[in-house]
Amino acid sequence: MADLKQVYHDKVVPELQAKFGYSNVMQVPRLQKIVVNMGVGEAIADKNFLNNAIGNLEAITGQKAQTTYAKKSIAGFKLREGQAVGCRVTLRRRQMWEFLDRLINAALPRVRDFRGVSEKAFDGRGNYTMGIKEQIIFPEIDYDKVDKVRGMDICIVTSAKTDDEARQLLAGFNMPFRKKEGNNG
């Protein structure tokens, strides 16, 4: 596996410069951060669920997870303001590149019935958000020690101004986008 940062500088930057006509290397879109968020609704009843989720997230990302708290009370969910409801990790620099490399080359191919990630998950400002239904697709998670299968949100923040620039940037890293299906008659 080649270092993704090196791939970015050697392959992706020249391709994007040629395609979009950037006159300066600094205009080329780049990754800024990756935010991995895990909501743990069961933490309201039992704090052990949150501790297990934090342990899983730290194993996956290699960085200490931050606990997230409820902003306001919702009686229907038996939720009080300030109660712990999840955890998140913000990855930058080396950890960001390593996580993206593991996500693309190791984790996503292990998803059941995987046909590629959606091309419609861009937010209009060059950021890409995807949801993962099972944390067990990551090789760092021991399947036998998992108490409950949880999902997570992964938000890839880029400096791209448009969705097309961000799509080309991620495609340069071999992000497996879903192929468009044509009419087979």
Swiss-Prot record:
Which cellular component terms (GO) are annotated to the entry? ribonucleoprotein complex; ribosome
Q: Name one GO molecular function term.
A: rRNA binding
An individual GO BP term: translation
Q: Which UniProt keywords apply?
A: Ribonucleoprotein, Ribosomal protein, RNA-binding, rRNA-binding, tRNA-binding
Q: Which domain of life is it from?
A: Bacteria
Q: Which Gene3D superfamilies match?
A: 3.30.1440.10
**What would be one Pfam family of this protein?**
Ribosomal_L5
Which InterPro entries does the record associate with it? Ribosomal_uL5, Ribosomal_uL5_bac-type, Ribosomal_uL5_C, Ribosomal_uL5_dom_sf, Ribosomal_uL5_N
Give a short account of what the protein does: This is one of the proteins that bind and probably mediate the attachment of the 5S RNA into the large ribosomal subunit, where it forms part of the central protuberance. In the 70S ribosome it contacts protein S13 of the 30S subunit (bridge B1b), connecting the 2 subunits; this bridge is implicated in subunit movement. Contacts the P site tRNA; the 5S rRNA and some of its associated proteins might help stabilize positioning of ribosome-bound tRNAs.
Could you give the subunit structure recorded for this chain?
Part of the 50S ribosomal subunit; part of the 5S rRNA/L5/L18/L25 subcomplex. Contacts the 5S rRNA and the P site tRNA. Forms a bridge to the 30S subunit in the 70S ribosome.
Q: Which family does it belong to?
A: Belongs to the universal ribosomal protein uL5 family.
Protein name in the entry:
Large ribosomal subunit protein uL5
What gene is behind this protein?
rplE
